[in-house]
Amino acid sequence: MDKVVKFAEPGRAFAKDSIRLVKRCTKPDRKEFQKIAIATAVGFCIMGFIGFFVKLIHIPINNIIVGS
């Protein structure tokens, strides 16, 4: 019986902590959600432009090296 309790205790503690976390969490309000969405969109755009310019720079360099 002691082994069963010893085996089940980590799962029980994890479930208890998870339930406490979910109860404590709150949904973001509209203003906070918009701020997060805008920050994410700006980050995606910046990363896209960086990738585009890196590709734009490396295409001519690659053509010079390969000689096509």
UniProtKB/Swiss-Prot annotation:
Pfam families: SecE. Residues 1-32 are cytoplasmic. GO terms for molecular function: protein transmembrane transporter activity. This is Protein transport protein Sec61 gamma-2 subunit. It comes from Drosophila melanogaster. Residues 62-68 are extracellular. One of its GO terms (cellular component) is Ssh1 translocon complex. SUPFAM superfamilies: Preprotein translocase SecE subunit (SSF103456). Gene3D superfamilies: Preprotein translocase SecE subunit. It is found in: Endoplasmic reticulum membrane. Necessary for protein translocation in the endoplasmic reticulum. Belongs to the SecE/SEC61-gamma family. GO terms for biological process: negative regulation of autophagy; post-translational protein targeting to membrane, translocation; SRP-dependent cotranslational protein targeting to membrane, translocation. InterPro entries: Prot_translocase_SecE_dom_sf, Translocase_Sec61-g, Translocase_SecE/Sec61-g.
